[in-house]
Amino acid sequence: MAIKIGITGGIGSGKSVVSHLLEVMGVPVYISDEESKKVVATDPVIRKELCDLVGEEVFFGGKLNKTLLATYLFASSTHASQVNGIIHPRVKEHFRQWSSHKDCLDIIGMESAILIESGFADEVDCIVMVYAPLELRVERAVRRDNASCEQIMQRIRSQMSDEEKCERASFVIINDGEKPLIPQILELIAFLYQKIHYLCSAKNN
């Protein structure tokens, strides 16, 4: 049975880079942001509930209006809870189905910016936090999303703080542009295999 890791971090922290490097090293990673979009696009119940909540225009020409949904979601914590309450239960079930086909592997991952807030942390065995300084995160996100600093800061304020996430994490990866990532990821994999060995020993005893 595979050990499941949850990869999280704030906007612009570099979660996707870490997930990609893990995949290169043979660890498949469920990208919850991408997979949730697929679930939303194909689940008629979600489509109806989002239309009832946000308005029919949230699906423009049959496709999800991601900008409108994001604007609604980040407008308040109440809006975020409403949207997440519709989407997250289906994504959890989708992840369970995905991971059930990978039981023969040692390690699999799930990447989510809101791993802890969404309750996805309950689906994994340990949390990996990707940390980057706030200024660098804002710079990366502004460049990537073609958004203003204020828009990015609004999103950051809507999420759990880095300090809280680090406290919950079993392992922290520093992605500040100076500390090399690959040695840290190799250290993470070694840490996970130690955990696997411990779990196997405990089970055999």
From Swiss-Prot:
A GO BP annotation: coenzyme A biosynthetic process
Localization of this protein: Cytoplasm
Gene Ontology cellular-component terms listed: cytoplasm
Pfam families, sorted: CoaE
UniProt keyword terms in alphabetical order: ATP-binding, Coenzyme A biosynthesis, Cytoplasm, Kinase, Nucleotide-binding, Transferase
Residues annotated for ATP binding in this entry: G12, S13, G14, K15, S16, V17
UniProt catalytic activity: 3'-dephospho-CoA + ATP = ADP + CoA + H(+)
Entry keyword Iron: no
Keyword Transferase: yes
Pathways per UniProt: Cofactor biosynthesis; coenzyme A biosynthesis; CoA from (R)-pantothenate: step 5/5
Residue ranges of domain DPCK in the record: 4-203
GO molecular function: ATP binding; dephospho-CoA kinase activity
EC number: 2.7.1.24
Enzyme class: transferase
Family indicated by similarity: Belongs to the CoaE family.
NCBIfam families to which the protein is assigned, alphabetical: dephospho-CoA kinase
Annotated function: Catalyzes the phosphorylation of the 3'-hydroxyl group of dephosphocoenzyme A to form coenzyme A.
PANTHER family given in the database record: BIFUNCTIONAL COENZYME A SYNTHASE-RELATED, DEPHOSPHO-COA KINASE-RELATED
Protein name according to UniProt: Dephospho-CoA kinase
Organism: Bacteroides fragilis (strain ATCC 25285 / DSM 2151 / CCUG 4856 / JCM 11019 / LMG 10263 / NCTC 9343 / Onslow / VPI 2553 / EN-2)
Phylogenetic classification of the source organism: Bacteria, Pseudomonadati, Bacteroidota, Bacteroidia, Bacteroidales
